[in-house]
């Protein structure tokens, strides 16, 4: 029963549309009406500003991605519970109940989960992404690697 509550809570935390809130608070816009239309840090970067993307990224990675998985690891001693809470947070980010099931792509939230599950892999992933971006000036391909 505790795990079910944690998974539902993880979905609700993951559903917090922080990119939407940043767009509303800073420029009084619905970020979904601009750029890619997604509720994510990349769209905030492109349409609100770089300065606004950093808190958006931090919230997505640490509050939405890492925190639910970390708390699940403390409350339960079940690795599947940690993964279930992390996936619920990603699903919440991608299909947020608060904004009629629209959302982002879940990359930052999934990265937050990866930090909890295997921080060494997360560091390697960031390294490959940064190197790919420096060489090719495009992160789209490198984020997936």
Identify the role of each PLM range:
Residues 12, 61-62, 114:
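Hydrophobic/small/kink-forming positions within alpha-helical transmembrane segments
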Residues 1-27:
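N-terminal signal-anchor transmembrane alpha helix
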Residues 2-6, 15, 114-119, 134, ...:
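Multi-pass membrane proteins that catalyze or facilitate reactions on polyprenyl-/lipid-phosphate substrates
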Residues 21-53, 102-103:
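Cytosolic, membrane-interface loops and tails of multi-pass inner-membrane proteins
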Residues 29-38, 97-111, 138-144:
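Short, non-helical or kinked segments that cap or interrupt transmembrane helices
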């Amino acid at each position: 029963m505790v795990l079910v509550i944690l998974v539902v809570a993880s979905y609700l935390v993951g559903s917090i549309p922080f990119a939407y809130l940043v767009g509303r608070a800073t420029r009084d816009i619905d970020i979904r009406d601009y750029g890619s239309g997604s509720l994510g840090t990349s769209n905030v970067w492109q349409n609100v500003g770089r300065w606004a993307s950093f808190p958006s990224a931090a919230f997505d990675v640490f509050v939405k991605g890492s925190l639910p998985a970390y708390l699940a690891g403390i409350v339960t001693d079940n690795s599947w519970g940690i993964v279930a809470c992390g996936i619920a947070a990603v699903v919440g980010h991608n299909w947020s109940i608060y904004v009629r099931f629209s959302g982002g792509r879940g990359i930052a939230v999934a990265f937050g989960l990866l930090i909890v599950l295997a921080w060494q892999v997360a560091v390697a992933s960031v390294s490959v992404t940064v190197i790919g971006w420096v060489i090719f000036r495009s992160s789209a391909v490198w984020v997936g690697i």
